[in-house]
């Protein structure tokens, strides 16, 4: 099982949904970085369950404990271990699926691969694991802030409801003022109503999280196999429920001619090389070109629904699976900080890797 990500800035997550704790060990964090524990906790609060009527009602404080690697408020350069203790497990809600495979869950594949599985809340395959990524991502954001790299994500689609406004015309921080995390209040209200109706119908719905990375210097990315967009895609696709990733013009770019799609270069008043358009999404040849990096991440509907479904058990017999427990009717409101965290982890790793190969 692969539980570690990164080359220089490396994270290893541990823990299960209904185990004692979930946590992360971060190796490669530079020394003498001021560690703002309040900021880490605020990032955890953005992801935690029970924060509104349109997310799971599992009640967890998700209070982070820093176990090592920090002294007098600064990183020491040694591994930083952080942990959150689980408090509101209701494992009995899952006893009915101990021998049954839930449709579109990881139950069957984990059972077949490992010959054994923790069925309580999905065990290691649960999205609760992502709290560890958010904690590590908060550290990454602190480092990136020192070099003026800023990452912001927001909900741009829920089911058929789309926010079509270009990100440059949006006040992205406004996304944090509503429970869906969409920066357009009018669209947000429609999304919230749609999710609430879906929940009342005992069903779930998917959505899209858009992300913008500003202030990226030219040169981040390691061709040919560790291209910047390839690693961003890998990081996003490792998040639970993600079914798609596109950056820049994405799939819409196939409808353009090369004469339309090419980003023409020019020199600005300071002599910096810029592009007139940004269909490349800030990345060319797998290397950042100094423009904004922007991408979109598609999340499927949550697999656990409160409607009876036909499935099979571990004996191959046809059974009925009914959803129990507490689950999100739509993951995207809580996925926003997870997308930001994984983007931050990727970007800080590439920043440090770039520093390692240049002497100037």
From Swiss-Prot:
GO cellular component labels: cytosol
Keywords, ordered alphabetically: Amino-acid biosynthesis, Aromatic amino acid biosynthesis, FAD, Flavoprotein, FMN, Lyase, NADP
Pfam family, one: Chorismate_synt
Residues noted as binding FMN in the record, renumbered to the chain: 124-126, 240-241, 285, 300-304, 326
Reaction equations catalysed: 5-O-(1-carboxyvinyl)-3-phosphoshikimate = chorismate + phosphate
EC number: 4.2.3.5
This protein's name: Chorismate synthase
Upper classification of the organism: Bacteria, Pseudomonadati, Bacteroidota, Cytophagia, Cytophagales
Gene this protein is translated from: aroC
């Amino acid at each position: 099982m692969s539980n570690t990500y990164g080359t220089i800035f490396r994270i290893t997550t541990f823990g299960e949904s209904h185990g004692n704790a979930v946590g992360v060990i971060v190796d490669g964090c530079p020394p003498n970085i001021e560690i703002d524990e309040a900021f880490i906790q605020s990032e955890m609060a953005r992801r935690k369950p029970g924060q509104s009527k349109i997310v799971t009602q599992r009640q967890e404080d998700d209070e982070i404990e820093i176990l090592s690697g920090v002294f007098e408020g600064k990183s020491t350069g040694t591994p930083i271990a952080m942990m959150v203790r689980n408090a509101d497990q209701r494992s009995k809600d899952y006893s009915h699926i101990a021998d049954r495979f839930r449709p579109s869950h990881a139950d069957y594949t984990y059972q077949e691969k490992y010959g054994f599985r923790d069925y309580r809340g999905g065990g290691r395959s649960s999205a609760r694991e992502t709290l560890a990524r958010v904690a590590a991502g908060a550290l990454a954001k602190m480092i990136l802030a020192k070099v003026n790299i800023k990452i912001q994500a927001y909900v741009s689609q829920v089911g058929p409801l789309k926010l079509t406004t270009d990100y440059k015309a949006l006040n992205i921080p406004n996304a944090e003022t509503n429970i869906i995390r969409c920066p357009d209040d009018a669209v947000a209200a429609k999304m919230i109503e749609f999710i609430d109706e879906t929940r009342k119908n005992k069903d779930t719905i998917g959505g899209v999280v858009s992300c913008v990375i500003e202030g990226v210097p030219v040169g981040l990315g390691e061709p040919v196999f560790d291209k910047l967009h390839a690693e961003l895609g890998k990081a996003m696709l490792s998040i639970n429920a993600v079914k798609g990733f596109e950056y820049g013009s994405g799939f819409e770019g196939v409808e353009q001619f090369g004469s339309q799609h090419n980003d023409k270069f020019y020199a600005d008043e300071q002599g910096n090389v810029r592009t007139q358009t940004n269909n490349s999404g800030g990345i060319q040849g797998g290397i950042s070109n100094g423009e904004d990096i922007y991408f979109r991440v598609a999340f499927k509907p949550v697999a656990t629904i409160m409607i009876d479904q036909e499935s099979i058990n571990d004996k191959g017999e046809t059974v009925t699976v009914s959803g129990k427990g507490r689950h999100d009717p739509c993951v995207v409101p809580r996925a926003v900080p997870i997308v930001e965290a994984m983007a931050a982890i990727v970007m800080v790793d590439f920043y440090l890797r770039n520093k390692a190969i240049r002497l100037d």
